[in-house]
């Protein structure tokens, strides 16, 4: 096992002239900084939810919507089949979620009880019951039938009338519509309508009146419990997949090796000593532990220095052990280390020293393609009395130190003389991370096949939901 660095003048260790792969390796970390700036904004980016009824786009001649826009009453006389009072929500159902659900409460079933609940497209004809037209579906109270895209319904569930709470929902995971009555699911059907759908309510005979609940009040149906059950189904399906213990062991081990977490690796090996079958993971899955173990102690020590904010010491160690990494003072690794040194000075309030350091080391990157925006963001730290509360707060997070440590780690791994230039970009991620990236792509592809509807895969959310 080769865990020592190559000679300082090793041609194979030159990270400054590795062609496109070396350049991609370096630029990857600059892109990660830019993503840090957008990370929380993207994760918190929500959708507008339906909150009330749309009084502009409705069959206004046959119904009256209350001032709070949460109840509707049929006030006309039903003389024709198309004298329907239809009203949609003010916004379409959200699509970046596991489920969507809303309810109505039948305050008065009127003369005929021809109340309906369902989903329609924005272009739906507002004098037709939901389900009578294409691209719509509706559960009707007078016969308990489900209508979807035509005037003829199909047996579906019980009728509903005065004092009943009836709900309509979309399960994006199973691609189904489902409907409830008084807190119990009465049926579900395949969701064969693409695009944005609006929660829709219809009344069709004199004095029919319903109250609409978009979630401001407690639902009769336990939607949170339903979602938990759906997630549990997904988890059980995953757990049925049999994976040999040594596969998971190998992935975790090479992850720890890749990032130089030597002490954690020792503890992990000790904890799994008597539980993992003695099968050599390399032969089974082509995971090369020798490559991941390369310069392990050096990488561990340098990571710790960066994580502690000891940038001067880290630079000195790199100069001593891997001068080829820092010989170009305008390389990405040097840039990241100098940025981090500047950040550490700002962190402890040494602003004047930070200004001087910035003029000496960061000014050389001003105007260089790929660096300018990050330099400006770094300098912006000086403009705030409390930079940790500013728009560039992420520079002061521990994750920023980890990112710089990862860049140094990858640069050292790329000096491995046993690796060809074309293989060096593989040091950007461990095998475990590559697997998770593939999983993310597969989940995105599945979501694309469902019309870009449903939850997007976020590992952090998955882990939190399965604790």
UniProtKB/Swiss-Prot annotation:
The keyword Cytoplasm applies. It is found in: Cytoplasm; Nucleus; Cytoplasm, Perinuclear region. GO terms for cellular component: cytoplasm; nucleus; perinuclear region of cytoplasm. Residues 9-25 have a biased composition (Polar residues). Residues 31-219 form the B30.2/SPRY domain. Residues 1-25 are annotated as: Disordered. Residues 244-276 form the LisH domain. This is Ran-binding protein M homolog. It comes from Arabidopsis thaliana (Mouse-ear cress). The gene is RANBPM.
């Amino acid at each position: 096992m080769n865990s020592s660095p190559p000679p300082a003048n090793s041609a194979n260790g030159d990270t400054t002239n590795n062609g496109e792969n070396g350049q991609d390796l370096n630029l990857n970390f600059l892109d990660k900084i830019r993503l840090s700036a957008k990370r929380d904004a993207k994760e918190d980016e929500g959708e507008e939810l339906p909150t009330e009824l749309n009084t502009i786009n409705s069959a206004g001649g046959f119904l009256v919507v209350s001032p709070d826009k949460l109840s509707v009453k049929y006030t006309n006389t039903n003389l024709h089949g198309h004298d329907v009072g239809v009203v949609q929500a003010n916004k379409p159902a959200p699509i970046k979620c596991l489920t969507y659900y809303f309810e109505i409460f039948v305050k008065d079933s009127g003369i005929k009880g021809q109340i309906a609940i369902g989903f329609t497209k924005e272009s739906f004809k507002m004098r037709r019951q939901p389900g009578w037209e294409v691209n719509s579906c509706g559960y009707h109270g007078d016969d308990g039938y489900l209508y979807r895209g035509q005037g003829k319904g199909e047996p579906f569930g019980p009728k509903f009338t005065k004092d009943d709470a009836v709900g309509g929902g979309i399960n994006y995971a199973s691609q189904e519509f489902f409907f409830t009555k008084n807190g119990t699911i009465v049926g579900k059907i395949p969701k064969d309508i693409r695009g944005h759908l609006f929660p829709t309510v219809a009344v069709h005979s004199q004095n029919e009146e319903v109250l609409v609940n978009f979630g401001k009040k407690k639902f009769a149906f336990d939607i949170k419990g339903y979602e938990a059950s759906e997630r549990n189904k997904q988890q059980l399906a995953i757990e049925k997949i049999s994976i040999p213990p040594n596969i998971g062991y190998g992935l975790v081990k090479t992850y720890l090796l890749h990032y130089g977490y030597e002490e954690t690796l020792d503890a992990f090996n000790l904890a799994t000593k008597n539980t993992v079958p003695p099968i050599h993971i390399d032969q089974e899955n082509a995971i090369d532990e020798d490559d991941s173990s390369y310069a392990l102690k050096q990488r561990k020590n340098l990571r710790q220095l960066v994580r502690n904010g000891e940038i001067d010491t880290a630079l000195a160690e790199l100069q001593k052990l891997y001068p080829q990494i820092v010989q170009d003072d305008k390389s990405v690794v040097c840039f990241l280390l100098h940025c981090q040194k500047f950040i550490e000075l700002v962190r402890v309030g040494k602003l004047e020293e930070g200004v001087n350091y910035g003029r000496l080391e960061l000014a050389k990157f001003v105007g260089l393609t790929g660096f300018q925006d990050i330099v400006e963001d770094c300098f912006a730290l000086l403009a705030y009395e409390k930079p940790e509360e500013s728009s560039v707060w992420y520079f002061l997070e521990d994750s920023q130190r980890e990112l710089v440590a990862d860049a140094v780690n990858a640069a050292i791994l790329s000096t491995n003389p046993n690796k060809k230039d074309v293989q060096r970009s593989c040091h950007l991620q461990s095998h475990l991370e590559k697997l998770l990236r593939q999983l993310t792509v597969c989940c995105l592809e599945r979501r694309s096949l469902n019309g870009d509807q449903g939850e997007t895969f976020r590992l952090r959310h998955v882990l939190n939901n399965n604790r």
